[in-house]
Amino acid sequence: MSLLNDIPLTALHFYLTAPYACSYLPDLQARSQVATPAVLIGTPVYSELVQHGFRRSGAYTYRPHCDDCRACVPLRVPAEQFTASRSQRRAWAQHAHLQASLHPLLDSAEHYELYQRYQRARHPNGGMDNDDCESYQNFLLQSQVDSLLVEFREQGVLRMVSVIDLLSDGLSSVYTFYEPDLPRARFGVYNVLWQIELCRKLDLDFVYLGYWIKHSRKMAYKTGYRPAQGLIDGIWQPLGKEFITKDAHGNL
């Protein structure tokens, strides 16, 4: 049993939200199961919750719990078993010159400006493209667990920012945003590979990539990191070849 200052995991309460519009599959209603109180969810407790399919948004810890849909599959990559595809190796080489630096969660006008441009370019009309500074801070800079912020720069120019949670058995990729105006760049792919490499250096087992949704183009890429494991019917199990997703160029 996980403990946080001698507080058992069973001290948490779980409730279901009211139905709301699904962010990933059109015309569907979603619900979430939320763990509370947030003050009790430190790193040990959160690590166990992640193993059961939970994620966090700021201090809000949840997992999908929809009435008639099970499309959201928690996904993780075993770091030591991971083998990069040819396309992924090209992305790694393309951006190997980026300089990464690790920081505590920090509020930065430079980060926020990049976040706004990323949202407007990559997720227009998705709701987050109009996030004000307070919404951004609540989403990415509020954390009850061990978190870090990673800057990626190219000759001093900020290209990408990633927020990562440190778990007992791995890393949880919270969110990444990057320069959207370099169309040939493959920052997102490079970032996942960088996190897998960091996981190996820290001698941790898994990189948790959030939810995979087969029919959501925004989420489908995650099965391209092989081997991938999905939490299905409460059991982490390998996702077979039928789950492998190609990108828009036909690359794995």
Functional labels for PLM-detected ranges:
Residues M1-P104, D205-L252:
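Terminal substrate-recognition subdomain of acyl/acetyltransferases
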Residues L49, Y115, V192-Q195, K222:
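Residue-level preference for non-acidic, small/hydrophobic
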Residues L171, E179-R186, L202-V207, Y211-H215:
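Nucleic-acid nuclease catalytic cores
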